[in-house]
Amino acid sequence: MTHVPGNHGLLDLYGCDEAILKDEGRLKTALMAAAQATEATILTEHFHTFGGAGGVTGVLLLAESHISIHTWPEHRFAAIDAFICGGMKLEKVKEILCRELAVERAVWTVVNRGSDLTLF
């Protein structure tokens, strides 16, 4: 019998609103909304805004794993990782962040982590 401990969602967002990609507060709110929609428990968060025309890097540490974001406003691009354990609603991360970042195109990949584990 096999068991998958978690699913890792990789979300590349293209054509995002440049102003949103620079707005740490708005990005934090969007990630928190995504985490809450998956029914995850937020343990802590840390966000950093880079100077000049730089973007934002942020992470939510969850009891069920993490959600992180890295933005490049100059390219209108954001990269998001969402690793969620258990039966959490991973698709909600994609749904909410695509809406909140006003994207033109999204590429979503889900990787089953630990799929070779065998339970006896």
What are these model-derived regions, one by one?
Residues 1-120:
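Polybasic/polar functional segments that serve as interface/processing modules
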